Amino acid sequence: LAYFKETCIGGESMRKKIRVAGVVNDSIVDGPGFRFSVFVQGCPHGCPGCHNPKTHPFEGGVMMEPEEILERMKKNPLLKGITLSGGEPFCQAEALAYLARQVHAAGWDVVCYTGYTLETLLAMEDPHIRELLEEVDLLIDGPFILEKRDLTLLFRGSSNQRLILVKPTLQTGSITLMEEDV
Protein backbone atom coordinates (compact mmCIF):
# COMPACT_ATOMS: atom_id res chain seq x y z
CA LEU A 1 0.00 0.00 0.00
CA ALA A 2 2.90 2.34 0.64
CA TYR A 3 4.09 1.68 -2.92
CA PHE A 4 0.63 2.68 -4.21
CA LYS A 5 0.68 5.95 -2.31
CA GLU A 6 4.21 6.75 -3.41
CA THR A 7 3.75 5.74 -7.05
CA CYS A 8 0.15 6.62 -7.86
CA ILE A 9 -0.81 9.66 -5.86
CA GLY A 10 0.60 12.74 -7.56
CA GLY A 11 0.92 16.31 -6.44
CA GLU A 12 -1.90 18.80 -6.26
CA SER A 13 -1.75 19.60 -9.99
CA MET A 14 -2.27 15.93 -10.86
CA ARG A 15 -5.56 15.89 -8.96
CA LYS A 16 -7.26 18.63 -10.95
CA LYS A 17 -6.69 17.14 -14.39
CA ILE A 18 -6.52 13.63 -15.79
CA ARG A 19 -3.35 12.36 -17.47
CA VAL A 20 -4.76 10.60 -20.53
CA ALA A 21 -2.91 8.22 -22.86
CA GLY A 22 -5.77 8.23 -25.36
CA VAL A 23 -9.51 8.00 -25.94
CA VAL A 24 -11.81 5.93 -28.12
CA ASN A 25 -14.97 7.85 -28.95
CA ASP A 26 -17.19 4.85 -29.69
CA SER A 27 -15.96 1.52 -28.36
CA ILE A 28 -18.07 -1.65 -28.32
CA VAL A 29 -15.50 -3.86 -26.56
CA ASP A 30 -14.88 -1.95 -23.31
CA GLY A 31 -18.21 -2.61 -21.62
CA PRO A 32 -21.91 -2.84 -22.44
CA GLY A 33 -23.24 -0.66 -25.28
CA PHE A 34 -21.45 2.13 -27.12
CA ARG A 35 -18.82 3.56 -24.79
CA PHE A 36 -16.50 6.52 -24.60
CA SER A 37 -13.26 4.90 -23.41
CA VAL A 38 -10.60 6.89 -21.60
CA PHE A 39 -7.20 5.24 -21.29
CA VAL A 40 -5.31 6.92 -18.47
CA GLN A 41 -1.53 7.23 -18.42
CA GLY A 42 0.42 5.50 -15.66
CA CYS A 43 0.28 2.00 -14.24
CA PRO A 44 2.27 0.34 -11.45
CA HIS A 45 1.33 -3.25 -12.38
CA GLY A 46 3.39 -3.97 -15.52
CA CYS A 47 1.43 -7.12 -16.36
CA PRO A 48 3.31 -9.30 -18.88
CA GLY A 49 1.30 -9.36 -22.12
CA CYS A 50 -0.58 -6.16 -21.25
CA HIS A 51 -2.80 -4.87 -24.07
CA ASN A 52 -1.70 -1.26 -23.41
CA PRO A 53 2.00 -1.25 -22.37
CA LYS A 54 2.48 2.32 -23.63
CA THR A 55 0.21 3.47 -20.79
CA HIS A 56 2.59 2.17 -18.07
CA PRO A 57 4.95 5.18 -17.67
CA PHE A 58 3.53 7.86 -15.40
CA GLU A 59 4.98 10.52 -17.69
CA GLY A 60 3.54 11.17 -21.11
CA GLY A 61 0.03 11.34 -22.38
CA VAL A 62 -1.86 14.63 -22.26
CA MET A 63 -3.50 16.46 -19.40
CA MET A 64 -7.26 16.81 -19.84
CA GLU A 65 -9.89 18.59 -17.81
CA PRO A 66 -12.85 16.38 -16.85
CA GLU A 67 -15.14 18.94 -18.51
CA GLU A 68 -13.31 18.50 -21.81
CA ILE A 69 -14.02 14.76 -21.69
CA LEU A 70 -17.69 15.42 -20.90
CA GLU A 71 -18.00 17.83 -23.83
CA ARG A 72 -16.59 15.20 -26.16
CA MET A 73 -19.04 12.62 -24.81
CA LYS A 74 -22.01 14.93 -25.40
CA LYS A 75 -21.26 14.87 -29.14
CA ASN A 76 -22.36 11.21 -29.35
CA PRO A 77 -26.05 10.66 -28.50
CA LEU A 78 -25.64 6.88 -28.82
CA LEU A 79 -23.31 6.48 -25.84
CA LYS A 80 -24.36 4.28 -22.93
CA GLY A 81 -21.50 5.53 -20.79
CA ILE A 82 -17.81 5.94 -20.14
CA THR A 83 -15.15 3.31 -19.60
CA LEU A 84 -12.09 4.17 -17.54
CA SER A 85 -9.13 2.01 -18.48
CA GLY A 86 -5.44 2.40 -18.72
CA GLY A 87 -3.02 2.48 -17.33
CA GLU A 88 -4.44 2.23 -13.81
CA PRO A 89 -7.47 4.47 -13.20
CA PHE A 90 -7.20 4.22 -9.42
CA CYS A 91 -3.84 6.03 -9.59
CA GLN A 92 -5.90 9.11 -10.54
CA ALA A 93 -8.87 8.34 -8.31
CA GLU A 94 -9.68 11.88 -7.16
CA ALA A 95 -9.99 13.42 -10.63
CA LEU A 96 -11.73 10.34 -12.05
CA ALA A 97 -14.25 10.28 -9.19
CA TYR A 98 -15.15 13.87 -10.07
CA LEU A 99 -15.47 12.92 -13.75
CA ALA A 100 -17.58 9.85 -12.91
CA ARG A 101 -19.98 11.98 -10.81
CA GLN A 102 -20.45 14.32 -13.77
CA VAL A 103 -20.98 11.35 -16.11
CA HIS A 104 -23.71 9.99 -13.83
CA ALA A 105 -25.31 13.44 -13.55
CA ALA A 106 -25.55 13.48 -17.37
CA GLY A 107 -27.36 10.12 -17.34
CA TRP A 108 -24.57 7.78 -18.41
CA ASP A 109 -23.06 4.79 -16.63
CA VAL A 110 -19.45 4.15 -15.58
CA VAL A 111 -17.32 1.06 -16.25
CA CYS A 112 -13.82 0.87 -14.80
CA TYR A 113 -10.92 -1.52 -15.36
CA THR A 114 -8.30 -2.01 -12.66
CA GLY A 115 -5.31 -4.27 -12.14
CA TYR A 116 -6.13 -4.31 -8.43
CA THR A 117 -8.73 -6.60 -6.93
CA LEU A 118 -11.72 -4.95 -5.30
CA GLU A 119 -10.58 -6.34 -1.96
CA THR A 120 -7.17 -4.64 -2.34
CA LEU A 121 -8.77 -1.32 -3.29
CA LEU A 122 -11.04 -1.43 -0.23
CA ALA A 123 -8.11 -2.34 2.04
CA MET A 124 -6.26 0.80 0.94
CA GLU A 125 -8.77 2.90 2.91
CA ASP A 126 -8.11 5.86 0.64
CA PRO A 127 -11.10 8.24 0.53
CA HIS A 128 -10.56 9.06 -3.16
CA ILE A 129 -10.46 5.39 -4.10
CA ARG A 130 -13.70 4.87 -2.18
CA GLU A 131 -15.26 7.90 -3.93
CA LEU A 132 -14.36 6.49 -7.33
CA LEU A 133 -15.62 3.02 -6.41
CA GLU A 134 -18.94 4.52 -5.32
CA GLU A 135 -19.31 6.10 -8.78
CA VAL A 136 -18.45 2.92 -10.73
CA ASP A 137 -21.32 0.75 -11.94
CA LEU A 138 -19.27 -2.13 -13.34
CA LEU A 139 -15.72 -2.89 -12.16
CA ILE A 140 -13.50 -5.25 -14.12
CA ASP A 141 -10.90 -6.12 -11.50
CA GLY A 142 -7.67 -8.05 -11.28
CA PRO A 143 -4.39 -8.01 -13.17
CA PHE A 144 -4.09 -9.45 -16.66
CA ILE A 145 -2.40 -12.85 -16.26
CA LEU A 146 -0.96 -14.13 -19.52
CA GLU A 147 -1.23 -17.79 -18.44
CA LYS A 148 -4.98 -17.27 -17.86
CA ARG A 149 -5.59 -15.42 -21.13
CA ASP A 150 -8.99 -16.27 -22.61
CA LEU A 151 -10.27 -14.38 -25.65
CA THR A 152 -13.79 -15.80 -25.23
CA LEU A 153 -14.44 -13.86 -22.02
CA LEU A 154 -16.81 -10.90 -22.04
CA PHE A 155 -14.92 -7.60 -21.56
CA ARG A 156 -11.89 -9.34 -19.97
CA GLY A 157 -8.55 -10.69 -21.06
CA SER A 158 -7.85 -13.35 -18.44
CA SER A 159 -10.02 -15.72 -16.41
CA ASN A 160 -9.00 -14.30 -13.01
CA GLN A 161 -10.67 -10.97 -13.82
CA ARG A 162 -14.21 -10.39 -12.55
CA LEU A 163 -17.20 -8.34 -13.73
CA ILE A 164 -18.35 -6.82 -10.44
CA LEU A 165 -21.57 -4.85 -9.99
CA VAL A 166 -20.20 -2.32 -7.54
CA LYS A 167 -23.30 -0.77 -6.00
CA PRO A 168 -24.91 -4.02 -4.77
CA THR A 169 -21.46 -5.29 -3.74
CA LEU A 170 -20.80 -2.25 -1.54
CA GLN A 171 -24.36 -2.34 -0.13
CA THR A 172 -24.26 -6.02 0.85
CA GLY A 173 -20.55 -6.52 1.50
CA SER A 174 -20.69 -9.56 -0.77
CA ILE A 175 -19.32 -9.66 -4.34
CA THR A 176 -22.13 -9.42 -6.90
CA LEU A 177 -21.05 -10.50 -10.37
CA MET A 178 -22.64 -9.34 -13.61
CA GLU A 179 -24.58 -11.88 -15.62
CA GLU A 180 -22.65 -12.50 -18.83
CA ASP A 181 -25.60 -12.73 -21.22
CA VAL A 182 -25.73 -9.01 -22.06
Please place each PLM-identified region on the residue numbering:
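Aromatic (phenylalanine/tyrosine) cluster motif
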Residues: 3-4
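Residues at the C-termini of beta-strands that transition into short coil/loop
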Residues: 24, 143, 167
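P-loop/Walker A phosphate-binding loop and immediately adjacent motor/lid segment at beta-alpha junctions
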Residues: 92-104, 111, 149-182
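Glycine-centered loop/turn positions within well-structured domains
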Residues: 45
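N-terminal [4Fe-4S]-dependent radical SAM core
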Residues: 9-39, 48, 52-58, 175-176, ...
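Conserved Radical SAM active-site core
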Residues: 15-21, 34, 52-132
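Conserved C-terminal portion of the radical SAM core fold
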Residues: 75-83, 140-146, 170-182
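Receiver (REC) domain switch/active-site residues of two-component response regulators
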Residues: 137
